[in-house]
Regions:
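Beta-strand/loop substructures that line and gate deep hydrophobic ligand-binding cavities in soluble
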Residues: 75-122, 127-129, 139-140
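A short, structured loop/turn motif at beta-sheet edges
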Residues: 15-16, 64-70, 91-100
C-alpha cells in the first residue's frame, strides 16, 4: 500500500499554459485562492508558496527537476515543520488534443496526507476551470477554504 496522493486530470489547453499555471506567480494567483508560487524554477532553486508575494510563506521547498513544459518535481514542507518534507511531481503531456496532468505527491506523513487530499483536488479543479473557461473556482469559499487543514495545497 502506498501513501502517495495521485491525481490525474485532462485539460483542454496546451502544456505551455499548464506549466505557466503552475510556475507563474500571477497566473497561479488567479486559481489558487490568491496564492502564488515563487521561484526561478531551475534545478536546485528554492520555491515558496505565499498569499502575499513571499511575506507570509505557507509552503517551501526545492526544485529537484525542471523540464519545461513537461515535468516539474519539487520538495514540499511547511516552514514551521521542515522535517515533514514530502515531494510533488507534475507530469504534463499531450493526449488526444488535450493535456494530461498527473500530480503525484509522495513521501507523505499522515498529517500531510490528510491536508493535501483535501487541498489538491480543489486547486487542480480550479486550475482546470480557469484554463478552460477563464473563471476559477473560489477555493477559499469551499467549506473551510483550501488552507484550513495543516499541510494543504494552499
Amino acid at each position: 500500500m502506498t501513501n502517495d496522493f495521485i491525481y490525474t486530470t485532462y485539460i483542454k489547453t496546451t502544456p505551455e499554459k499548464v506549466w505557466a499555471a503552475i510556475t507563474n506567480p500571477e497566473f497561479a494567483r488567479q486559481y489558487w485562492g490568491n496564492h502564488t508560487n515563487i521561484s526561478d524554477w531551475k534545478k536546485g532553486s528554492e520555491w515558496k508558496h505565499s498569499p502575499d508575494e513571499g511575506k507570509n510563506i505557507k509552503m517551501i521547498g526545492k526544485v529537484l527537476e525542471s523540464t519545461p513544459p513537461k515535468r516539474l518535481v519539487i520538495t514540499w514542507a511547511s516552514p514551521d515543520n521542515r522535517a515533514d518534507e514530502s515531494q510533488v511531481a507534475f507530469d504534463i503531456a499531450m493526449v488526444e488534443g488535450m493535456v494530461r496532468l498527473d500530480v503525484v505527491h509522495s513521501k507523505l506523513s499522515a498529517d500531510m496526507a490528510k491536508g493535501i487530499s483535501f487541498g489538491w483536488p480543489l486547486v487542480l479543479s480550479s486550475m482546470k476551470s480557469f484554463l478552460e473557461t477563464g473563471k476559477a473556482i473560489d477555493i477559499m469559499a469551499i467549506k473551510g477554504g483550501c488552507g484550513s487543514a495543516k499541510g494543504q495545497a494552499a
